[in-house]
């Protein structure tokens, strides 16, 4: 890659989720041969973000869970501390340096870090950043229906983001910077977007929860969390046909193909 373009995987922490729900219709008799779970049959998931330095822009994909979970939810999800600020510091940046945040969707493990609690005050984690969200995703997160109500519980955070004027809604494909583009695919959520990286000497895609881990590369392996398994399957097929490296959102062993 050219000097002005840099891509850095960022670890925002770890949490655990039900293995059966994550791996969908893949039979346990198959996956348990190679995939480890804890005593509650939970998979350990890393919260993988991507930091992209594209000339004068410093773009972060997703924000992780954040630091606002109560003790009960921390126990349920076996959540570590919010590692994102420290992970950014380890590569020479701070939250204030981020110019853009791309949110693949607004579930808690990807959008929980939009707002952080600092000294008892709720404030934007990335106050200088424009936050890019698909219009369909924003609308369902702001006023979720009965099917989606349990998945979206950050209305206060979203209101603060809107109030501070740091929100940009897009509809479909949109060019974020010279080398970074978002594309709405749906599937996992109604307004889910993937991020395509089009660099001069290579291309890649951040598939997010469409392909969260290496086992999800197999087309039939689709989690039970999808709002539309059919759309997720179509998105997976399209991504694989691109024949470019795929960054995973939750694999604990590898960052990409």
Kindly give the residue locations of the regions a language model identified.
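Metal-dependent catalytic neighborhoods of phosphoester/phosphodiester hydrolases
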Residues: 74, 112-121, 257
